[in-house]
Amino acid sequence: MSALLEVRGLVKHFGGLNAVDGVDLDVNEGEILSVIGPNGAGKTTLFNMVTGLYVADGGSIHFDGHDLVGLQPHHICTLGIARTFQTVRLFPAMTVLENTMVGQHCRTRSGVFGAVLRLPRTRAEERRVLEQSRLALSFFGSRLAGYRENQPAFALSYANRRRLEIARAMATNAKLILLDEPTAGMNPRETQEMTELIGKLRDERGFTIVVIEHDMRLVKGVSDRVVALDYGRKIADGTYDEVANDERVVEAYLGKRAAEEAAG
């Protein structure tokens, strides 16, 4: 497998805090990579730099041959990276289908002029957006497709809102999807379903996936490889068993837990 995403020496400071401190990371094409670590380890900050929400203070990010540092989020989206967030970010009053279509804004080129005049190019683009959105929703079966596509997002269960965020990312026609804590707030049954779904995203739809997750059952169930961060630094990189048994990873988790218990 070739590296689709290459991160070298990545740095991000917030005041005197080194949120990400010299991280190297490769994501291979067709791989499911999990990024783990205690709260505050720099996981989401890493995602934010890859997707252009934060500008790196040092280091490099290359995706599919493109230098991402300094690019705007919409430009990075057009190159083939999509993401979800820790907290659900949908348009509650818009329908399931409309929320999915919104995800393709970075790939649409028809402006107001074309929309008003209903130019052929605009109509063709609208058909493409609609077809791509319904294809993404169909992956989730009756949970999002069929009659549900016309329901407002606020009417969905929490788990289905999470699924809708993933559908929106899929509809961008991305090569790489970044999932930030996709099972946060889910019960064990929903977590197991999400574990299976992430595997199918790669196996059936061909996405390369990086997932930030605290639930080790999901991490063990889906990961080809696991990277552990602590205090902004990479402390382990390998298979699930290799990382889970790494003394530095055990210390990072147990050390944080002991400190929390002492404070409580």
Give names to the regions the model predicted.
Residues 2-264:
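Glycine-rich phosphate-binding loops of nucleotide-dependent enzymes
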